[in-house]
C-alpha cells in the first residue's frame, strides 16, 4: 500500500528528493529514481508537480543517463531559475569498470567517477537529455581538493551580488581515515564555474553529502548529510 500523504514514486525505487523549486505556477519535485526495480540501481531523476503538496501530478522522467560522463547514473543535485529557464544541476556518474553481474551497480567503490553536470529546460517539463546536457565541472584530479569518486550533490543559489554559488559535498584523506569537506564554486552565468574555497571539519563525519547553505541574520549555515561509514 502507498501512503496517502507522503510523496512516493508511481512505481519502483525512490530516494533523495532533488531540485525542489517553485517554477511557472507549480512546485516541482525531482527525486532519485530507479524505474526498473524496487531496489537501488542506475539513478534517474523522477519528476512531479503540485500546487498543494497533497495532490501530485507525475511527469515523465526528467533526467536519465545519456552521455559518456553520466552513463551510469544521474545522482542528486538542485534546481534554480535563471532568465526564465529551469537549470538542473546534478552529479554525473561513470563506472571505470562495468559490473558483469549487474550493470546497474558499480563493480567496486574505486570504480566510481564523479563529475558535475547541467541540463536546461525552457518550460520545466521537457528536458533534452541528448542535446542539452553539459559537463560543467570535470572529475576532480587533485586528492587534496576532494575525492574523485565521492564529490557530489551540487547545490546552486544566486548571491546578492548577482553571481551564482555552488557547494558540493566531498571527502579527503585525514590521518588514518577520511574527513568530510565542502567545496565552493562561483559563476557569472550559472554555467561556467570556478573553484573558490573549501571547508572541512575532521570531527564531523568522514563524508559530507547533499550540502546546503543558508544565510541566517549575518551568518551562513552549511548543512550536510553526514556519512560515517
Over which residues does each language-model region extend?
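Beta-rich carbohydrate-recognition and catalytic domains
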Residues: 1-153, 157-209, 215-229
Amino acid at each position: 500500500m502507498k501512503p496517502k500523504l507522503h510523496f512516493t514514486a508511481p512505481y519502483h525505487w525512490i530516494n533523495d528528493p532533488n531540485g525542489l523549486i517553485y517554477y511557472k505556477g507549480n512546485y516541482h519535485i525531482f527525486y532519485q529514481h530507479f524505474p526498473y526495480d524496487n531496489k537501488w540501481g542506475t539513478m534517474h531523476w523522477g519528476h512531479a508537480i503540485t500546487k498543494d503538496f497533497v495532490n501530485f501530478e507525475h511527469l515523465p522522467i526528467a533526467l536519465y543517463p545519456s552521455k559518456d560522463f553520466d552513463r551510469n547514473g544521474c545522482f542528486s543535485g538542485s534546481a534554480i531559475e535563471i532568465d526564465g529557464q529551469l537549470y538542473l544541476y546534478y552529479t554525473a556518474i561513470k563506472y571505470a569498470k562495468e559490473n558483469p553481474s549487474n550493470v546497474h551497480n558499480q563493480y567496486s567503490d574505486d570504480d566510481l567517477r564523479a563529475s558535475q553536470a547541467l541540463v536546461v529546460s525552457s518550460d520545466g517539463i521537457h528536458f533534452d537529455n541528448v542535446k542539452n546536457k553539459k559537463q560543467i565541472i570535470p572529475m576532480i584530479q587533485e586528492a587534496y581538493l576532494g575525492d574523485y569518486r565521492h564529490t557530489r550533490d551540487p547545490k546552486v543559489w544566486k548571491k546578492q551580488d548577482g553571481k551564482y554559488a555552488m557547494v558540493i559535498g566531498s571527502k579527503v584523506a585525514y590521518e588514518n581515515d577520511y574527513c568530510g569537506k565542502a567545496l565552493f564554486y562561483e559563476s557569472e552565468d550559472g554555467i561556467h564555474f570556478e573553484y573558490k574555497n573549501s571547508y572541512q571539519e575532521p570531527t564531523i563525519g568522514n563524508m559530507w553529502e547533499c550540502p546546503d547553505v543558508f544565510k541566517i541574520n549575518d551568518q551562513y549555515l552549511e548543512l550536510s548529510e553526514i556519512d560515517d561509514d
